[in-house]
Each structure stands twice: as C-alpha cells, then as structure tokens.
C-alpha cells in the first residue's frame, strides 16, 4: 500500500539487488510485440515471423555490444538461474568424460552453489574457494586450486549481497593460461559495471533482464565462439539458439532485455555517477550519526549501488520491522526468508552476532536525493531507539564480551 508524504511515495524502494523497476522506455519498446507485432520469430514464411525475428536479432546485438561480444554468442534463456545451470551443467556434461573438477567460490549465488552440489552427487569434484575479509578471492589460492582435471572456474562479477567486484581480468588470465573455461555469473554486473568478455577472457557469462530495468522471465548466456566452447543443452526440442536452448523465443521479453541493455550501454556513465554520489551521501550521513556501523565488503572494489551495513547490537529483522517505510532486505532475496545469518558474511569471517545485524540497501537509477535524505533520517532515529531498548547494546557499551557470556537455559 503506497502512501504519500511531502511528494515522497512510501515505501521507498531500496532493494535494487532483488529486482529493478521496469524502465518506462523498455515498456514502450515491448508493447507492440504483445499486440500488433505478435509473430513467432521462428516462422520464416511470412512477414509476421520476419518482423519478430528482426527484433530478436537486433536485441541480441544490443546485449552483445554491452559486453564486447558477437551477437551469435548470445543465447536467450529464462533468466540468470537457468543461464548458470546451463553453463555449469552444460560444461560438466560435455567435457565430463575428459575432466571432472570445477572451481567456484563460497560466496557465489545460491543457484551456482546448488548446481555444483548437484554435480557433486554425480561424481564431479568441486573446490569452493574461500574469500578474504573484504569479500574478494585470493588469486594465489585460485592458481593453486587448478589441476589438470579442472574444466571450469565459476566466479561471479558482482556479489548480490555485498556488491564487491571480483578481479575478472586477472581470473580470466589465469584460466586462459591454464586452459580452463571461465564462467562468470554477471547478473549483478551486466549493465552496471564495465565488463568486456575478451579483455577478461570470459568464456561463459550469465545475464538477467530484471536486474537492469528490464522484464522478469528473460535472461541470456554468453557462450564464446572463438576459441569455441561447447555445452550440452538442458532442454531439448526444436533446436533453437544454436541447439543450446530449445523453445519458442518470447519476443516481447527479448525486446525488453535488448532495450534495457542499449539504455545501459548509453547511460552507464551517468547511472554510475548518480549511484556513486548517493552511496557517498548515504554512508557519510549514517556514519556521522550512528556509531559502530560496518560496511560489509571492500569499499572501493565494489558496485556502489549495494550497501550492506551491519548495525552492532540490533537484530536485522527488528531493523526491517522498524523501518517499514523502506523496502530493504537482510541478504539475498532468494534466502532472506530464513533467519540464518548470511552465508556470504559468515564466509568473510564476520562473526555471527554482527552478521545478524546486517541490512542490504540498494540504490539505483530511480533513487532520488530526497529519498536518501528521508531514509537516513528514519534509519538514524530507529537504530538509536532500538539500541536504547537493547540490553545487548548496553552490555557492549560497558565492554562486556557477549561471546563469553554463558546464557542460562530455562
């Protein structure tokens, strides 16, 4: 239920890592393909089909352009979860009779970790690399983990929970030198940070529409043609998408993804400037008014549309309830329904108490200065109020180490 306050529409959306609103320009581009331009892009005997096919191919080119790829290297899927599964399982199934080792990272998105666990049940060996306290992998540890049995390294571009950017160029160089395929889940990075698949030697990259102001239900997988990468399809049928992903293509959604990619290509610099300014404003204001607030993840090597903050002494769930006028989350939208502390924060070495106090704030293209001002004011008043009520905060101020307390059970 939306309410209005001094030209502000409440609640304020600050969960841009979970999803983004559809850019009105994207909606406008999509609409004709639901109504008058409804043809099947695989129908080659009449103008309805040709028109739809042209729109699909134009979108394919716009998506490729954003990552320095060729249009033919873009395979359409239903979203980044499918793309990640297709990349990881597709490589394992195609090359599995020659090699049987995959390397990924403990802080990857759930769908990458679950795809790898699924392959482990089928006999594939998986190494889960640790991350440093700043959320970034150690390149030496990666180098040492690669064996002659390694077929794939999968490392995400931008982390969905803490926003850190992994050193893709250096990872790609190591993989290319060792003759290992490099997959990157780029759902949170595509269209937000510069990614060049050739510069970074990326062989496979997963893309999502709804993370870049495009529609839900559409994504893509970049699959390198030179040197050629082969994958076994997960879905069999009419052989669409170079035989890698069968099924009639959803033209309106593809047009939406292509338009969103084109806008990102033209406006990335402007978006980055806007987001960086609001990030600095938000963080400086919070730090100046609240003590013991910790930014999770490297401050510089990050996409600044993601602020994951821990507020010592206050439970994350109680913060969310207290700041109902802000739409935020306590971690990945796919796992924030559980009361377990974030596995990403735990793998960075953040202790359990502090991990429980973390909130992820998302800033995006449509966030305004006025919204940031309101958010800061609300957060500061509520956090200070919650701390006044918290016996744990009081004990911390008295220098008592909460870890050493033996709590009585009743």
From Swiss-Prot:
It is found in: Cytoplasm. GO terms for biological process: [2Fe-2S] cluster assembly. The active site is at residue 334. The keyword Transferase applies. The modification N6-(pyridoxal phosphate)lysine is found at residue 211. Its EC number is 2.8.1.7. One of its GO terms (molecular function) is metal ion binding. Pathway: Cofactor biosynthesis; iron-sulfur cluster biosynthesis. Its cofactor is pyridoxal 5'-phosphate. It is an enzyme of class 2 (transferase). Signal peptide: none annotated. One of its GO terms (cellular component) is L-cysteine desulfurase complex. Pyridoxal 5'-phosphate binds at residues 80-81, 160, 188, 208-210, 248. Its main location: cytoplasm. [2Fe-2S] cluster binds at residue 334. It catalyses: (sulfur carrier)-H + L-cysteine = (sulfur carrier)-SH + L-alanine. NCBIfam families: IscS, PRK02948.1, PRK14012.1. HAMAP family: Cys_desulf_IscS. Belongs to the class-V pyridoxal-phosphate-dependent aminotransferase family. NifS/IscS subfamily. Homodimer. Forms a heterotetramer with IscU, interacts with other sulfur acceptors. Master enzyme that delivers sulfur to a number of partners involved in Fe-S cluster assembly, tRNA modification or cofactor biosynthesis. Catalyzes the removal of elemental sulfur atoms from cysteine to produce alanine. Functions as a sulfur delivery protein for Fe-S cluster synthesis onto IscU, an Fe-S scaffold assembly protein, as well as other S acceptor proteins. This is Cysteine desulfurase IscS.
């Amino acid at each position: 239920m939306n309410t209005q306050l001094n030209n502000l529409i409440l609640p304020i959306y600050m969960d841009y890592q979970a999803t983004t609103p559809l850019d009105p320009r994207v909606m406008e581009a999509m609409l004709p393909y639901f109504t008058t331009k409804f043809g099947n892009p695989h129908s080659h005997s009449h103008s309805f089909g040709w028109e739809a096919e042209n729109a699909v191919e134009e979108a394919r080119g716009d998506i490729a352009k954003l990552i320095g790829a060729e249009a033919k290297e873009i395979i359409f899927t239903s979203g980044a979860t499918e793309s990640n599964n297709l990349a990881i399982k597709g490589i394992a199934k195609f090359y599995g009779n020659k090699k049987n080792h995959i390397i990924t990272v403990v802080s990857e998105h759930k769908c990458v970790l679950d795809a790898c666990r699924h392959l482990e049940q089928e006999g594939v060996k998986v190494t889960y690399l640790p991350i440093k306290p700043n959320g970034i992998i150690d390149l030496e540890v990666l180098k040492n983990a690669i064996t002659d049995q390694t077929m794939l390294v999968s490392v995400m571009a931008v982390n969905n929970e803490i926003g850190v950017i992994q050193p893709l160029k250096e990872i790609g160089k190591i993989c290319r030198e060792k003759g290992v395929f490099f997959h990157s889940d780029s759902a949170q990075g595509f269209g937000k940070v510069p990614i060049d698949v050739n510069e970074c030697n990326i062989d496979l990259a997963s893309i999502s529409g709804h993370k870049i102001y495009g529609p839900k239900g559409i994504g893509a997988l970049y699959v390198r043609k030179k040197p050629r990468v082969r994958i076994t399809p997960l879905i069999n049928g009419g052989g669409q998408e170079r035989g890698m992903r069968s099924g009639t293509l959803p033209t309106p959604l593809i047009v939406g993804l292509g338009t969103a990619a084109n806008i990102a290509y033209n406006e990335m610099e402007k978006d980055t400037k806007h987001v960086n300014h609001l990030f600095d404003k938000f963080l400086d204001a919070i730090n100046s008014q609240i003590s013991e607030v910790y930014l999770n993840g490297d401050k510089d090597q990050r996409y600044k549309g993601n602020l994951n903050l821990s507020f010592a002494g206050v439970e994350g769930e109680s913060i969310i309830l207290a700041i109902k006028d802000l739409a935020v989350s306590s971690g990945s939208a796919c796992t924030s329904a559980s009361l377990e502390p974030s596995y990403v924060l735990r793998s960075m070495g953040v202790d359990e108490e502090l991990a429980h106090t973390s909130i992820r704030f998302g800033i995006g293209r449509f966030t305004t200065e006025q919204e940031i001002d309101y958010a800061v004011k609300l957060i500061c008043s509520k956090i200070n109020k919650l701390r006044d009520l918290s016996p744990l905060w009081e004990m911390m101020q008295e220098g008592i180490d909460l870890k050493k307390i033996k709590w009585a059970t009743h």
